[in-house]
Every structure is written in structure tokens, then in C-alpha cells.
Amino acid sequence: MSRSNRQKEYKCGDLVFAKMKGYPHWPARIDEMPEAAVKSTANKYQVFFFGTHETAFLGPKDLFPYEESKEKFGKPNKRKGFSEGLWEIENNPTVKASGYQSSQKKSCVEEPEPEPEATEGDGDKKGNAEGSSDEEGKLVIDEPTKEKNEKGALKRRAGDLLEDSPKRPKEAEDLEGEEKEGATLEGERPLPVEAEKNSTPSEPGSGRGPPQEEEEEEEEEEAAKEDAEAPGLRDHESL
């Protein structure tokens, strides 16, 4: 009987019991074989397991026709997904897993239990999420760089303003000093005018100088008279 199983050929959609190492004969369906995997999996069929929605590549020796082996292998089993698989093969034999890809490769010898397709889908999503997080990280790194550049530009502008600010007060001081000098010159200019007014004679045509000069001349005349009288007095006293 096993010899006939090895020689039996299955086609897509055939319902079988598939035997994997470490697992009971499981309700399954012969699925499509991808063209890319035909050479590497010669004489092996891609099998879809009901209940678990996993896939594997198995040879004819590990496959048994469902109708012929239902009484032998279709007994209830405590393994998770087995009862669901028996229900699906009877009521929904065309079921497919969400995100199922027929190109996935599984081997009963290499893998004790085929992994569900959903796991691979989750891995892809996770990879995409990691990729997006990397992009976000780049953006976050770029933003501080831009902020640093902007801050550097602001610092440079502030430094230029500080350098210009001491020059401006100095220029303002120079302007103020010039204005003060101009004011002092203007304040000194009226003094000669006043001196000219004081030097003018009190009465026009009198020919006399200022009152102070007249007083000095009178004092000098009196002193000369006293000196002239002084010898006469001395001679009289000597007599």
C-alpha cells in the first residue's frame, strides 16, 4: 500500500492526510506548486494544512487520500487545530489563510512544524515598521542639525551687531564732542564785542579815556606834586 502511495500522483485541490515528523496525519489539501520551486522540490507537492493554515512541501510517500484514509486518520485528536482542520476539510475545503503565499517553501525534514503564513506577514509589517522608524530617526537627526545651523547663523549675526555697537557709540561721542566745541566757540565770540563796548568813550568827542584811566592820571599828578614839595620841607627843617 505504501508503494502505491509513492507512485500515486496528485493534482491541485486534492484532499489528503499529510504526515509530518512529530505530528499525526493531518487533514490537508494539495495546493499549487510555484514554477520557481518546481526544480528544487522535484516530486514534492505543496500542501496546505487545514486548521493551522500552514504549508509544507511533502513527497507522495507522506500523502494519503482523504476519502480512503478518513476512518483511519480522521479520529479526534488533542493537538491544537486538528479538530478545526477536520471541520474545514468537510465544510470549507477551499479555505485559504489571510496573506497566504503559495510560494512559501516548507519541508517536513527540515522543519518539525511549518510556520503559519500570518507570521511571515507580521514579519513584513514589522520590517516595514522598522524601516519607517529608521526614516523617522533620520528626520530627527536632520532637524537638530538644521537647528544648530540656524543657531550658528544667529550667533554670527549677534556677534556682528556687538562688534558694530561699540563703534557706533564712539562715533556718537565724536559728534557730541564736535558739537560741544562748536558751542564753546560760539560762547567765546561775544566777549570781544563787550570789550569793544567798554573801551568806547563815555562821551563822544570828549577825547578822554575811560573813567579808570582818568583816576589813575590824577593819582600820578598828586604823587608828583608831593614829591616836588618834599625837598622844600626838608630844607626848611634843616634850617
Swiss-Prot record:
Region named Disordered: 69-239
GO CC terms, sorted: cytoplasm; extracellular space; nucleus
Biased composition range(s): Acidic residues: 110-121, 212-224
Source organism, top-level taxon: Eukaryota
Bipartite nuclear localization signal, short sequence motif: residues: 155-170
Keyword terms, alphabetized: Acetylation, Cytoplasm, Disulfide bond, DNA-binding, Growth factor, Heparin-binding, Isopeptide bond, Nucleotide-binding, Nucleus, Phosphoprotein, Repressor, Secreted, Transcription, Transcription regulation, Ubl conjugation
Keyword Repressor included in the entry's annotation: yes
Compositional bias per record (Polar residues), positions renumbered to this chain: 91-106
Gene this chain is encoded by: HDGF
Glycyl lysine isopeptide (Lys-Gly) (interchain with G-Cter in SUMO2) crosslink location in chain: K80
Modified residues (Phosphothreonine): T184, T200
PROSITE patterns: PWWP
The protein, known as: Hepatoma-derived growth factor
A Pfam family reported for this protein in Swiss-Prot or TrEMBL: PWWP
Binding sites annotated in the UniProt record for heparin: K19, K21, K72, K75, R79, K80
PTM comment, free text: Sumoylated with SUMO1. Sumoylation prevents binding to chromatin. Phosphorylation at Ser-165 is likely to be required for secretion.
Matches recorded under PANTHER family: HEPATOMA-DERIVED GROWTH FACTOR, HEPATOMA-DERIVED GROWTH FACTOR-RELATED
GO biological process: chromatin remodeling; positive regulation of cell division
Basic and acidic residues bias (residue ranges): 135-172, 180-197, 225-239
Crosslink site: Glycyl lysine isopeptide (Lys-Gly) (interchain with G-Cter in SUMO): K80
